[in-house]
Amino acid sequence: MAAMSADPLMLSVVIPCLNEAERLPLLLADLQRWPFPIEITVVDGGSNDHSHRISALAGGRFITEHPPGRGKQLAAGAQHSIQQNQGKWLLFLHADSRLPRHWGSSVLRRIQHPDAQRFAWFFDLHIHPSTPARRLLEGVIALRSRWCQQPYGDQGLLLHRSLYERSGGYAALPLMEDLEFVQRLSQLTRLRPLGLAISTDGRRWQRGGVLRRSLENAWLRHRWRRGESPARLAAEYYGKPFSTI
């Protein structure tokens, strides 16, 4: 049988997941607004809820990477999509994300531009539910993403398959996988805003409030850049014993 050629307008979506049965259906419904064929790969880290069934009902592929680790899950999902040789564009999203209503037509216009595949693309971030402190944080993140070329994983990442492969793809890190990847990407190309806002669940900002959590995250990033083990930092971030990460 001849190898299937990649569809230039097919979108290959990779979603790392761990016990997201409550939020995953909303994102999967949003993704159905893509006006062309779409391939959805949910990479699970060992969920014990209904994430598998939900993914199957939405027509997505469900693969398992255990023990969980977002970098490992993202890398596995991308590799799976590339091996299928269907979509030329890869879109990485977190399972608790929500896409705006007209995201499909907006992204389609973007990738049809002749120069689009030269760049990597990210969404602006909206944290739900909204508070004044979170609005301020969103503004800081928008500036950081544009000026420093360092969007967070919560903002999603869209890039052509050829650019992903040239960059080396996601590293199998338990933490900081998003920053490590965009740092390598920024050495090859510019990361550009899509001009759309993606919503993320604000649960991670509830513990200690926005300021405290932002300072904790900044300290973790500083220690990572200084060379500390991502596994040790992940254990601290997720509140798990170092040996289980």
Predicted features, each with a name:
Residues 2-5, 183-245:
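Hydrophobic helical membrane-anchoring modules
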Residues 22-26, 49-58, 102:
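Acidic helix N-cap motif at the loop->helix transition within catalytic regions
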Residues 29-38:
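Short, acidic, metal-binding catalytic loop of nucleotide-sugar glycosyltransferases
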Residues 44-52, 97-98:
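A conserved acidic beta->alpha catalytic loop
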Residues 65-82:
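Glycine-rich, basic loop-to-helix element that forms the pyrophosphate-binding segment
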Residues 90:
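Short aromatic/hydrophobic "clamp" motif used to bind/position activated sugar donors
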Residues 101-133:
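Conserved donor NDP-sugar-binding/catalytic core segment of glycosyltransferases
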Residues 120-134, 141-159:
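A recurrent flexible, glycine/aromatic-enriched loop bordering the glycosyltransferase active site
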